[in-house]
């Protein structure tokens, strides 16, 4: 205990001596924003924290006893829980590198039960050498490109068409002039895949990504590839250890180009089991002939669902006024092997595809912005037919989990946002 106290005093003294040589504002910087939204939706929606703040998709058609659509009910809300605060610290050099530490949070909590509570967003340190960088801690998932994401007024950066996740990770980046290469290993954190809480931890191997970027003054583009392993169970319902795992791959590409008048952004991702990114995806048990030993022990094998998502975002460049539009599309491509659809774990297996288009206007004065946006979303949900003559007609799914019979549900969201940055 005494040794720990002495060590802390030595570190604190060293930091204070170093800090005296620099202005406090050069060392510690507080930043963030105070944001408040007024939102109106024409339909009940799947949303984050049930605050109409991050509307992901319109809810499906559900009829009451009179044949009226229950979810065709509008809602309105004021909220400011996405307000954010962070601190960035430029510390003394370490291991021959410049050091930076960041802690950032907001008030969304990590579930509906904890909304309005403080939530950790980022908590990382960076070691910057001349040509390379090591980032350790919680930061954006590699599929989320901090220099190329939608500029929506609505909170959520284009989710579920754009990945949205922050994860504990190790990320090493090497710079080759205009080209940079990075490798990342990460775990889920509180952005988890559906299923058991420790579904990734028990797989033992972190999710791994590699990425290559090309950047100039007015352009950035890149490609990336990721691999993830999950272990849905460690013991079966019949009390036998099972070691079955789910392997999934993701590939993505992005670009951003800036001209004098306009900025163009585009992104596309094809992947498996990406529900931890708040996107379509998941896994299910294989529909196959199992051995008698597997049946006796209750062991099942799994496969992933595939999905495709893409978006474009265009906006004008201005210091006091910007107009823009976002358009996104996602499609559920089912599995490559036959599955038992009743065992699916993930997001939106009951949706064939979904789209969104959202024009916006943003007014800027000093550190204050006023933004308004109209967001139209549509999702084609599974619609089975109990009177059908085949299993596919009855359930609305084929043997590979593809949705074959649909009905559309759509929603309009109107938003007015006031934000003060500091």
Residue ranges and their predicted role:
Residues 23-50, 61-62, 67-191, 204-205, ...:
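Outer membrane beta-barrel
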Residues 367-399:
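C-terminal beta-signal and adjacent terminal beta-strands/loops
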Residues 44-49, 113-117, 146-154, 191-200, ...:
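Outer-membrane beta-barrel translocator domains and adjoining extracellular loop/strand segments
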Residues 218-351, 355:
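Detector for outer-membrane/organellar transmembrane beta-barrel domains
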Residues 49-68, 391-400:
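A solvent-exposed, charged loop/short amphipathic helix patch at secondary-structure junctions
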Residues 24, 72-80, 115-117, 161-164, ...:
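Short sequence motifs at beta-strands and strand-loop junctions characteristic
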Residues 406-422:
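Outer-membrane beta-barrel "beta-signal"
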Residues 1-22:
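Bacterial Sec-dependent N-terminal signal peptides
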């Amino acid at each position: 205990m005494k040794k720990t106290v002495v060590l802390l005093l030595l570190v604190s003294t060293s930091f204070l001596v170093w800090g005296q040589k620099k202005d406090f504002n050069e060392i510690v910087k507080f930043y963030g924003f105070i944001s408040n939204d007024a939102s109106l939706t024409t339909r009940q929606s799947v949303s984050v924290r049930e605050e109409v703040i991050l509307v992901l998709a319109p809810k499906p058609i559900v009829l009451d006893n009179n044949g009226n659509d229950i979810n065709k009910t509008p809602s309105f809300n004021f909220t400011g829980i996405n307000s954010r605060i962070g601190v960035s610290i430029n510390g003394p050099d370490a291991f021959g590198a410049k050091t930076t530490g960041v802690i950032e949070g907001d008030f969304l909590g990590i579930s509906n039960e904890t909304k309005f509570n403080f939530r950790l967003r980022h908590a990382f340190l960076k070691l910057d050498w001349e040509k390379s960088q090591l980032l350790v801690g919680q930061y954006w998932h590699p599929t989320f490109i901090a220099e190329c994401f939608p500029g929506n007024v609505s909170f959520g950066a284009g989710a579920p068409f754009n990945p949205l996740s922050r994860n504990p990770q190790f990320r090493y980046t090497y710079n080759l002039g205009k080209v940079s290469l990075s490798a990342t290993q990460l775990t889920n954190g509180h952005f988890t895949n559906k299923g058991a809480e420790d579904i990734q931890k028990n797989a033992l191997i972190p999710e791994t990504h590699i990425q290559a970027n090309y950047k100039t003054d007015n352009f950035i583009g890149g490609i990336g590839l990721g691999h993830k392993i999950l272990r849905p169970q460690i013991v079966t319902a019949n009390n036998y250890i099972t070691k079955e795992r789910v392997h999934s791959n993701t590939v993505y590409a992005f670009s951003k180009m800036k001209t004098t008048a306009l900025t163009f952004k585009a992104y596309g991702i094809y992947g498996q089991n990406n529900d931890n990114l708040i996107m379509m995806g998941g896994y299910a048990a294989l529909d196959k002939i199992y051995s008698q030993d597997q049946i006796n022990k209750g062991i099942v094998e799994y496969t992933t669902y595939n999905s495709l998502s893409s978006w474009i975002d265009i906006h004008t460049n201005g210091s006091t006024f910007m107009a823009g539009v976002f358009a996104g599309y996602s499609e559920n491509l089912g599995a490559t092997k036959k599955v038992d659809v009743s065992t699916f774990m993930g997001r939106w297996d009951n949706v064939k595809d979904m789209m969104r288009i959202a024009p916006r206007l943003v007014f800027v004065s000093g550190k204050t912005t006023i933004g308004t946006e109209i967001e139209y979303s549509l999702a084609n949900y599974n619609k089975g037919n109990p009177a059908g003559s085949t299993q596919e007609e009855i359930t609305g799914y084929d043997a590979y989990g593809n949705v074959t019979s649909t009905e559309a549900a759509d929603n309009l969201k109107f938003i007015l946002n006031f934000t003060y940055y500091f």
